[in-house]
Swiss-Prot record:
The lineage of its organism: Bacteria, Pseudomonadati, Pseudomonadota, Alphaproteobacteria, Sphingomonadales. GTP binds at residues 17-22, 134-137. The gene is lepA. It is an enzyme of class 3 (hydrolase). This is Elongation factor 4. It comes from Novosphingobium aromaticivorans (strain ATCC 700278 / DSM 12444 / CCUG 56034 / CIP 105152 / NBRC 16084 / F199). Residues 5-187 form the tr-type G domain.
Amino acid sequence: MTDLALIRNFSIIAHIDHGKSTLADRLIQYTGGLTEREMSEQVLDNMDIEKERGITIKAQTVRLDYTGKDGKTYQLNLMDTPGHVDFAYEVSRSLAACEGALLVVDAAQGVEAQTLANVYQSIEHDHEIVPVINKIDLPAAEPEKVKAEIEDVIGLDASNAVLTSAKSGIGIEEVLDAVVERIPPPKGDRSAPLKAMLVDSWYDPYLGVVILVRVIDGVIRKGLQVKFMAGGTEHLIDRVGCMRPKIETLDELGPGEIGFITAQIKEVAQARVGDTITTVKQGASEALPGFKEVQPVVFCGIFPVDAADFEKLRESIAKLRLNDASFSFEMESSAALGFGFRCGFLGLLHLEIIQERLSREYDLDLITTAPSVVYRIQLRASRNDDAREILLHNPADYPDPSRIETIEEPWIKGTIYTPDEYLGSVLKLCQDRRGIQTGLTYVGGRAQVTYELPLNEVVFDFYDRLKSISRGYASFDYEQVGLREGDLVKMSILVNNEPVDALSMIVHRSAAEARGRHMCERLKDLIPRHLFKIPIQAAIGGKVVARETISAMRKDVTAKCYGGDITRKKKLLEKQKKGKARMREYGNVSIPQEAFIAALRMGEE
């Protein structure tokens, strides 16, 4: 058992690429967590995608032993948290498990938008925040300027910020000393009923679900019968341990400690992040605050390119779900794309990661339909149905427009950091996306803009456009601010007067015409010509808002007539005309798969 005064629980907050995982690697190396030979880049990022993109998706933990200046050995529990907005709830639970945080800022780039969001969460948890200025050995490093920025933007005293270079190992000891001296020890009562917070969980093929816990009060040990208070399930603990970063089995975890437990749980969905774990007998009476069900925000359809891969896709999605309970799916079928799944995600990065893992780990070729958000629709009463409220995930399920009383869509509050010279383009982009500006401040040579935007406009291609107009310099972060009423309509795309379900979308009435025209032009270039004219239309209800026509290929039926009578030619041309009219009525237009994929990738405008 470790004395509470010798425990320090801390997390690392940083924007993508500011050196968070590298700093964690150095701390592990310095405290002897791994030998030189076992050390690899980004030890705590287990997934290939995490390493390649330089992002952290799942929260990871590692226990380090460090002998301080006073000669005592401290137990340091480092939580490596995700930095991206999609995983904001995971971050909030990881932060709630700690008493302090290292704020890592790149000495050359300064404070970025994502750093801010997580710092404010950390401040809400009353954390002691230690600023760490990283990459000080870069030629472009300006530590003094960054210190001033931390003070101006975040309002933290950065006079005693630790200067480090995680890559070359400068200042690592100073970071560890700062953790020991400046971050407070946890509080807890060993004799009280067990109360532990479930910080994260993941699936291990040998152990079942591994659960990361922070013990608040009481003791957790092997053989205990515990219950999850929000989930309501009971389990018998069969292993207790910690990561150093290799798995080490322990007898027990006491108050203030962070470690893992296994209890032969088969699905991650049973172990919900933020839940409270207590004993079945004489357990805690009330759960820890802050638990909430994670709801998917962005939805899209995922279909196999080859219909024969459907079963493989079903198995792969089910396996991914074992490890990621925040991702939901149900079967759907489309006339154009066959069988597939309607999947829900926490945000766009989450969608991209799942899609990439499906294609990479399970070797699947996939088509994803345009992402959409959840709309709340109030329906009027009809002759055979009462007035009611529905949630709409899929544009194909859009109800009869005459019954719709109101439609509400989710809005977000976005914070954008951008260098001055790109400010005009950024403001124009936000206005084009129906944004409402709520603030504009200048920090050094950069502007911080806050906008309220409909999430529907952001999921489409907002992030890519923002990066391209600012040459990659702008950073963006958002939080949800609830639902608001909007003038939204369903736009259907008709090819040869037949609606194509996979291409229908919900858009704001003001943007419908432009979006419809763009889609029709796109399809005109992609669908091959047939022997008859093909109209492509974008329609809202019965009203066509945009139209393009693919002209017919012409077969020269008069080629076999040599000179002679004009009436013979007229007769043949008349016959051809009738045939084409009949074809137009009964002919099927085959839309090639590539046309679908290209039309759905409208982001490349």
